Curated annotation (Swiss-Prot):
It comes from Rhizobium etli (strain ATCC 51251 / DSM 11541 / JCM 21823 / NBRC 15573 / CFN 42). Belongs to the EPSP synthase family. Keywords: Amino-acid biosynthesis, Aromatic amino acid biosynthesis, Cytoplasm, Transferase. This is 3-phosphoshikimate 1-carboxyvinyltransferase. 3-phosphoshikimate binds at residues 26-27, 31, 170-172, 297, 320, 324. Pathway: Metabolic intermediate biosynthesis; chorismate biosynthesis; chorismate from D-erythrose 4-phosphate and phosphoenolpyruvate: step 6/7. It comes from the Bacteria.
Amino acid sequence: MTRTAKLTIIPPGKPLSGRAMPPGSKSITNRALLLAGLAKGTSRLTGALKSDDTRYMADALRAMGVAIDEPDDTTFVVTGSGRLTPPKAPLFLGNAGTATRFLTAAAALVDGTVIVDGDEHMRKRPIGPLVEAMRKLGIDVSAETGCPPVTVRGTGRFEADRILIDGGLSSQYVSALLMMAAGGDRPVDIELVGEDIGALGYIDLTTAAMKAFGAKVEKTSPVTWRVEPTGYRAADFVIEPDASAATYLWAAEVLSDGRIDLGVPNDAFTQPDAKAYETIAKFPHLPAEIDGSQMQDAVPTIAVLAAFNETPVRFVGIANLRVKECDRIRALSSGLNNIREGLAVEEGDDLIVHSDPALAGQTLPAEIDTFADHRIAMSFALAGLKIGGITILDPDCVGKTFPAYWRTLATLGVTYRDKD
């Protein structure tokens, strides 16, 4: 397939309007795929996301003996035996952080050796804290560089019953350990420590999905969970639309003074990034300081929106954005300053956007380096709704989580010029 090298957004001459349903949640789809793969029996996952990230997860599970059928564009039918088997080759997961971290932990339940690997971007993303936490349970696991590839020599048995992990690190580590623990041989307590507890909402997503597949997990304190060794049972599971994807549509609506029907009430989302709706709705009077710690994937959306705000905006609690698909703080400041020098500045791990509503209606030719990051591409497309000359490099990277993004904007009234 030929990839599009560049895509220039042409600012629409009228408000965007129409119906645009976000795809299924990536976060929930990958959790449900793993839990269904660990379960005994056949599960039906509906409303699922079919994208690069979820295909990596599905293919890895197939390599470990799970049967997965795809009867339509939003359904997975998953049949597991209750145990994963050692794959014949290393699991290649591209730059899919959820799949990599979740499967690294799940590999401990395999009776044999599993190598979890990814592309050149994934090989720069840290996984050391998860590896260390697994070692505390007596699991034989190694990652020489602190990043993938990771080698796990599993047995399905643990030598300890308690894990302490820094709550300021990626919530994906905690979710990975929780899902793994239910497949072990003894109850396990998982406790977050440290002053900064980030992205608790994603942990809530994990425990809700675990319970739907028969696990017994109890929150024994605000930062502690006890997981019983119940294993998982097959279930039919409905996946809600992706709240992170919805943020682009909410922002497009307020930027264009349009009316976009997402097909789902804003308060129906259970994902943490849905919190962004209340913030986005305040545009062009966004708060002077926005804490992104509990809605991390929405920060790029709001940061680009902030460029057109009435007053400057400081983003705090976003240090983890430096170890996403790219250094998103650096990518955001670079892209905004490429539009106009001085539009953004980094102060430590904070990002300050020096908003200027007068940007709207100007022509400021700028090529935006996406760093192969889907969220950078989708967020900076929003700038192109108000500024002429915004060109997105490697626009096809949106296939990671929202393959139909450009087509969706087009149905709402956005047009493009592309160059292969």
